[in-house]
Amino acid sequence: LIKTIDPKKNIFLFELTSKRKIVLISIKNTIKTSEVENLGAEFYGRIKNEKNNEYFLVSDSLDAKHINFLGPFLHGLKLKSYEFKKYKSKKNDKVISINIVGSKNKPSLQNQLKFKALEQGTFYARDLVSEPGNVLHPDEYAKRINSLKKLGLKINIFDEKKLKKLGMNT
């Protein structure tokens, strides 16, 4: 049985049994990095509600044109997986494992570190904007941003006097 998940994205599901499925992703010859990230996000959207929680990506099946496919694909998947769970009483603790099988076309350690830094920054920003206003007031926001100094970020926090002096009319 073949079920087309989304023919525009070229993601197809083959059901072998109720517990075993194969997901095929067809890639265009020329594909932009943002499209690859969107495919990763689309893939996560499809698998997040499945009973199965372990998936295998075969990296050897990628041709030379798509040598840098897996890094952005996994990055898009990771960004899509974000959930703000801080105030939820029932937390979804499901862990989805993505295993890369094969010896070719794996993302380099440098790429993995770059994407991890982007994901951490994105998730931090998403956490901040998801906090309610009665929790993340200006003083608390300044405190949280100030904690980024340890990462080497230069931070200037202005009080009301400094803002008036700069002509910001607060």
Language model feature labels by segment:
Residues 1-170:
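Short amphipathic alpha-helical segment within the helicase RecA-like ATPase core
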